[in-house]
Amino acid sequence: MHYIQRKDGRDLETVDEFTTAKEARAMLHEYRTADPSAVYYMSRRPCKHWKE
C-alpha cells in the first residue's frame, strides 16, 4: 500500500491510501495543488491512528 501523509506544523496525518504508486503520485499532485499551506508526501506506512 501507498499512503499520502499531510504535515502541517506539528500535526501529521494520513489522508489517503492507494494500491499503486502511480495512482498515489497522481493524487499527491492534486493534494499539493488544493492545499499549498501544508506539506504532502508519499509513504509506505500510515500514521499510527490511520486504522482506528
Residue map of PLM features:
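Acidic phosphotransfer microenvironment of two-component signaling modules
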Residues: 22
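Short, mixed-charge low-complexity intrinsically disordered segments
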Residues: 12-15, 25, 29-52
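A short beta-strand micro-motif
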Residues: 1-8
